[in-house]
């Protein structure tokens, strides 16, 4: 049981990092994402019609989704704002999000999380053909659930924290970046010069810098981040152009 629990923890962490990297949106979009609404897997099924794998996966977020998950609002002349009219569709390449592990996570790991959160009877398993629970189900039960977390969604900041820990590990242990704090916790302290560096928002800077600043593919950078070139150039890209 302990090994299974640990496997679920590690696979969840991998999925958080891989999906944030593949998607390019803000943390709130993925934190609020629900299966069947925003996460749309094309399933491979056996002769009985039961899901046995994922062929491909499409995500679909809209400007008129509920506030906790919708795309960033655009500002109108005069200071008003309205949701973007268009729908943003994207896909997760298997080179970033391993589809075999994704299937195990979506069906099996999320089933265990749903059981612990009280969202699914213990004798049932998530059926991906009809699944509408959160993409990232909090493994901790909550006594009171708002509409925003009715599907078991993680609390604010948790996804960014998981991504930040992975980014810190990569910078320190894989890339050997000198001068880093001794731990991720030290990097997050209020007086640390690295505070705010390790978090999910960094992937948007990386995307804008690589696709826009270095390769001058602002069209792709805009699609990846669902943001506009002036904003990406001013606040995200680290390459002056």
Labelled PLM ranges:
Residues 1-28:
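Basic, Lys/Arg- and aromatic-enriched nucleic-acid-binding interface segment
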Residues 3, 117-120, 127, 160-230:
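Short, basic (Lys/Arg/His-rich) helix/loop patches that form interaction surfaces
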Residues 11-13, 25-26, 88, 110, ...:
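Short, cationic motifs built from Arg/Lys/His that form the positively charged side of catalytic pockets
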Residues 16, 29-33, 221:
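Alpha-helix N-cap/helix-start motif at helix boundaries, enriched for small hydrophobics
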Residues 24, 35-36, 76, 141, ...:
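An acidic- and aromatic-residue-enriched active-site/binding cleft used to recognize and process polar
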Residues 50-152, 157:
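Basic, alpha-helical nucleic-acid-contacting "clamp/cap" segments
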Residues 30-49, 53:
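Acidic, glycine-rich loop-and-beta core segments that form the ion-binding/anion-interacting portion
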Residues 223, 232-241:
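DNA/chromatin major-groove-contacting recognition/catalytic segments
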């Amino acid at each position: 049981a302990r090994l299974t629990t640990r496997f679920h923890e590690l696979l969840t962490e991998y999925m958080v990092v891989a999906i944030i990297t593949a998607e390019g949106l803000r943390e709130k979009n993925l934190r609020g994402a629900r299966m069947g609404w925003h996460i749309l897997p094309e399933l491979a099924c056996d002769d009985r019609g039961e899901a046995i794998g994922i062929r491909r996966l499409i995500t679909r977020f809209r400007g008129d989704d509920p506030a906790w998950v919708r795309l960033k609002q655009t500002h109108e002349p005069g200071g008003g704002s309205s949701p973007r009219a268009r729908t943003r569709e994207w896909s997760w390449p298997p080179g970033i999000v391993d589809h075999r592990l994704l299937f195990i996570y979506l069906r099996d790991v999320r089933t265990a999380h749903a059981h612990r959160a009280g969202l699914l009877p213990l004798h049932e398993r998530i059926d991906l053909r009809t699944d509408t629970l959160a993409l990232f189900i909090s493994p901790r039960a909550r006594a009171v659930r708002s509409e925003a977390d009715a599907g078991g969604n993680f609390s604010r900041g948790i996804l960014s924290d998981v991504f930040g820990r992975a980014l810190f590990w990569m910078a320190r242990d894989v890339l050997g970046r000198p001068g880093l704090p001794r731990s991720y916790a030290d990097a997050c302290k209020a007086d640390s010069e690295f505070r705010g560096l390790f978090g999910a928002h960094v992937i948007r800077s990386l995307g804008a810098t690589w696709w826009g600043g270095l390769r001058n593919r602002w069209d792709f950078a805009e699609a990846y981040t669902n943001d506009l070139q002036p904003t990406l150039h001013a606040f995200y890209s680290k390459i002056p152009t």
